[in-house]
C-alpha cells in the first residue's frame, strides 16, 4: 500500500520507512504496488505515480529522503523503471498506464512520450532495450517497438502489433536480434526485434492455453 522500507542486511533492523501514498501522493493501482525498486547510485527508484507529477520517485538509500521526481501520468503502472544509455545519453524509461516515457535522470521534463493507454492499467513487464529499440508488450493492446535516435528527444514508433504479439506478465527475452515472448493466444513466440516478423510459435506446448498463461523465460 505504498510503504517503502530499508533494513540492515545483517541484523534485519529497520533503517527507515516511508509512506509514499500519504507523504508523496502516490497513486495505488488496482492490484497494489508491485513494481520492483530500481537501485541507482546512492538512490533507489520507485514507479509509484505521484500526483500531480512524479511517475518515478527517487529516494536516498541511506535515509529515505526524497531526492527527485520525474514523469507525469494519471497513475502508477506495475512495470519497473529501466535505466539505459542511449546514443543521446542516459535516460530513464517508464512504462505507465497511459504512456511510455523517456525521462531525465534527476528530474525535469520528459525527453519524449509515446501514448499507450493500457486496459486496467496493466503495464507489467519491465521494458527491454537493445539495438536502440525500446520494446513493451501488453495483453490487450499488443507490442510497441520504439526506435531512439541520436538525440535524447528522438523517439518514434518503429512498429506495432496489436493482434499477434500480446504479452502480459512474462518478461520478454532478447538474444542476437531475436525476441522471445509468451503470447496470450499462441504461446511462446520468437520474432525479429527490428521488424516484428514472427519466426515461430509453440502453440502453448509449454504453457496452458487458458487465460493468462505465465512462464519465466531465461
Language-model region placement:
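Noncatalytic, solvent-exposed loop/strand surfaces
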Residues: 1-218
